[in-house]
Design a protein with these regions (language model features):
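Extended amphipathic alpha-helical interaction segments
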Residues: 144-291
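Hydrophobic membrane-insertion alpha-helices, especially the h-region
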Residues: 8-21
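Hydrophobic single-pass membrane-insertion segments
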Residues: 21-32
Length: 333
């Protein structure tokens, strides 16, 4: 069962990679780098928090520790979102009344007054950005995504001012911009691995200068190592495609040595064998299904019966799951 889960995980990752490829390779002309200007000192540690996934505020946290100096920082929006989960919005007047009372209960009067005024503006911003976004349309390419990111931040600057908007959202925007630009490079089918790595390093230097090398920490956990291994394969996709099958396999083994222990490599090779066996099983099934469907001497009812028997024989206890997958695929078409 555990090995089947691993196989499913690998297939899901491959599917996500294909979707990412189709999406990002449609980008058109470039958008200038650094939506958040370099003069706005955004901590590289703050950006890394967003790259790893910035968690929502929990009820057990004391929000005062994030605003001991300034009320405007990357935790401000997080704090406002937390308030909205704790204080229901029946109507704006009652909501603001409750929010004001809460802020004055946890912050000193001056900070509470400033934070409440900022929250009122934040509510108006949320309404305004929803209306603005309707005119921008849904991003369809990587270039569209960058333009959308730029447009959203420009709107925030109009509402809050440049300094405040960049302080509140700057780290998040830089993390998103870097991720989009890196993916454009990563899935470019015309580039070899070494060129992709060079361009990504150039991107880091362009966005972070002397701190470029520290923007992405070496993987520590097994999921992080596996993600880095998958990324390495994506970077060297063209190289791998141009190699004969045996050399391609050897290259993949080299990549694995960079991230996994000997025991982990053995388990991955076992999974490789099982994935190959699953693919062969499905290939054999479809060949037999085709023979049944193209047999002019069998009625449609008999064909359906024969195919169901074939599925039961080929996939055993997994036959029902296979049929459900076929139904989903047929409904999508």
């Amino acid at each position: 069962m555990k090995k089947k889960k691993i196989i499913i995980t690998i297939l899901v990752i491959l599917a996500v990679g294909i979707i990412g490829y189709l999406f990002y390779t449609k980008h058109s002309k470039q958008v200038p780098v650094n939506i958040i200007r370099s003069s706005q000192k955004i901590s590289i540690q703050d950006v890394k928090m967003f790259l790893k996934g910035f968690p929502s505020e929990s009820a057990s946290e004391d929000p005062r520790k994030y605003f001991s100096k300034d009320i405007v920082n990357l935790y401000t929006v997080r704090f406002f979102k937390f308030i909205q989960t704790q204080i229901e919005f029946t109507n704006k007047e009652e909501h603001l009344k409750a929010v004001k009372a809460y802020m004055y209960s946890i912050l000193d009067p001056q900070k509470a007054a400033e934070m409440f005024a900022l929250y009122e503006k934040f509510l108006d911003y949320e309404t305004g950005i929803r209306e603005q976004a309707k005119s921008w349309g849904q991003p369809k390419t990587a270039d569209d995504l960058l333009r959308y990111l730029q447009s959203v931040q420009d709107y925030r600057r109009e509402i809050f001012g440049i300094e405040v908007a960049d302080a509140m959202w700057g780290a998040e925007v830089k993390a998103k911009e870097y991720t989009i630009r890196k993916n454009i490079i990563k899935v470019d089918p015309n580039l070899y691995g070494t060129e992709k790595e060079k361009r990504i390093n150039d991107l880091k230097e362009n966005m972070w200068g002397a701190d470029a090398a520290s923007i992405e920490d070496p993987p520590q956990s097994d999921p992080e190592k596996y993600a880095s291994y998958q990324e390495k394969q994506a970077l060297y996709q063209r190289d791998l495609q141009e190699l004969p099958a045996d050399q391609r396999l050897e290259k993949i083994k080299e990549f694995r040595k960079d991230y996994f222990s000997s025991d982990q490599i053995v388990r991955l090779e076992q999974v490789d064998e099982e994935v190959a066996a699953e693919k062969k099983k499905e290939g054999d099934y479809y060949a037999q299904e085709k023979a049944i469907m193209s047999n002019p001497g069998i009625t449609d009812d008999k064909k359906a019966e024969a195919i169901r028997d074939l599925q039961d024989s080929a996939f055993g206890e997994e036959a029902d799951a296979f049929r459900r997958r076929l139904n989903i695929q047929n409904n999508i078409k």
